[in-house]
């Protein structure tokens, strides 16, 4: 129905470009099937982008360098899922190393520790996000930097820390 589609599009525009959302954000506008169909039509028309199954984005457009559509990052999608599910997440492995600047490698599949539901999310770019259930003590850090450092050092391994790592 066009009315639901207009309501959804107006709300998405208010949130701004780069916003990640799902059908559950628009349940006040109508029946779940109608909302899903409206999102499907909007994605087909190019107003929004389907990032993963059930997850959409109002894309940013790069006008300065003419790069076109800028897709949301792993972090944006993962943070949206965590917020929606009321879960805590923290990146692990090579992605934690990349976030800290200890590695230039950007992994194709990112793994997050979570206290929420474990799952795999396939992004349309062929990449993926994996949420692995963990003990609450692994998420108990009060400082995000300390948590990332701990997980990055775990990835590097005991005795494998080099002078180059220490310089960063």
Residue ranges of predicted features:
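Short beta-edge/loop segments at beta->alpha junctions of small alpha/beta modules
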Residues: 1-80
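Short coil/turn segments at secondary-structure boundaries
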Residues: 22-23, 109, 165
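Amphipathic alpha-helical interface surfaces
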Residues: 35, 92-93, 145
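Short gly/ser-rich loop at a beta-strand->alpha-helix junction or flexible surface loop bordering the NTP-binding
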Residues: 51-54, 87-124
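Generic structural signal for hydrophobic core residues of well-folded globular domains
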Residues: 81, 100, 152-156
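Basic nucleic-acid-binding interfaces
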Residues: 84
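A short, charged helix-loop
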Residues: 122-133
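Hydrophobic alpha-helical interaction segments
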Residues: 133-168
